[in-house]
Amino acid sequence: MDETTREMFSPHNLPLEMMEEILLRLPVKSLTRFKCVCSSWRSLISETLFALKHALILETSKATTSTKSPYGVITTSRYHLKSCCIHSLYNASTVYVSEHDGELLGRDYYQVVGTCHGLVCFHVDYDKSLYLWNPTIKLQQRLSSSDLETSDDECVVTYGFGYDESEDDYKVVALLQQRHQVKIETKIYSTRQKLWRSNTSFPSGVVVADKSRSGIYINGTLNWAATSSSSSWTIISYDMSRDEFKELPGPVCCGRGCFTMTLGDLRGCLSMVCYCKGANADVWVMKEFGEVYSWSKLLSIPGLTDFVRPLWISDGLVVLLEFRSGLALYNCSNGRFHYPVSNSISGCRDAKVYLKTMVSPNDL
C-alpha cells in the first residue's frame, strides 16, 4: 500500500459514519484494542448507544459455529459459574472453560435469570439480590435487594429477563405463587426507574409448569411453559412493550398425550421440546413469533431417558443439548450423541447462551 492510500484510510480521514459502520461489525476483542488507535475511536466505542447497536448487529450471526461466533455458553452449578465459547464446543478437541467465581465475590448459589445483549442477570440466594453481569468485559451491577421473597418457603418465585425496546429499558419479571395455589402475582423491575411495580394482566387459571425454569426472551417477549384449566399445555407470554400477559398455543402435538414440554431459543426463534409417552422427543420452532401456523417440527430425538433443552443448532444440524447432568451434542444426520461435551462443565445445573458484547451493566 503506497503512502497516498495509507493516508486515505487512516482513522483521521475516514468519515465518522463509515468508521462507525466498520467498527460495529468487529468482535469485542478487536474493539477493545482499537480504543487505543485514536481519541475519536475511543470516544465512539465507549458510547452506550454504540454498545447497543453493536449487540443488535452481532445477534444476526447467531447461527454460526465458526471461530468468529460471538456467542458463548454460561453454566451454573451449586458452587460454580463457568463459561465457554460456542465454537469450541463444536470444533475444538479441548474445550477452554473460564471460571468466574472470583469475579463474583465467591457467592455460593447462583440462579441465572436470563441473558440479553450480553448481559447475564442472576439471582443470589444468600442475600436475595439480583445482579447484572457482562462476563465478556467483566463488569457487574447489583440491581436490587429483592423484597419478593421472604423466609416463608411456601412462596415460589420464577423469573425472566429481557429488553423493552419501546422504553430502552432492561426489565426483570417475577412470577410469585404460593405453593398449592393457582393464583400468580406478577412484579416487574425496571433498571431505568430502579423500582418494582405490580402487573395484573396475568391470565387466571394458568400455572407455570416448571418453576425452576426462567422465562425465554424472544422478540421483546418473555415466555414460560404453562398449564391451564382450558388446555393441557400452553405458553404464557409477556409482551414487554405492551406490558401485558397472554396465552400462546403450542404446536398441534401438545395435546393431552404430551406429558411435559420445555421452552428454549433456537436461532432467535421460540423452540419447544414435547415429550409424549412411547414416542420421541420432538423439537419444534415457531418461525414467526406469535403466529400459531408457523410452528414447524425441526427434529425428533429418539431414546431419551432424561429431559433436554436445545441451546444451539449449527447449519449442519448438530444440536447442543442441555441435560440435567451436563451438555451434549446430537448429530441429526447419524443419530449419534457426543457426551459430555467437556468434563469441565459436566454436572451443570443450568445453562444459558449469551452474546459477547460491550454493553455495560453500569450504564443502565
UniProtKB/Swiss-Prot annotation:
Keywords: Kelch repeat, Repeat. GO terms for cellular component: nucleus. Residues 8-54 form the F-box domain. Gene3D superfamilies: 1.20.1280.50. Kelch repeats lie at residues 169-215, 216-265. SMART domains: FBOX. Transmembrane segments: none annotated. CDD domains: F-box_AtFBW1-like. PANTHER family: BNACNNG10540D PROTEIN, F-BOX PROTEIN CPR30-LIKE. This is F-box/kelch-repeat protein At3g23880.
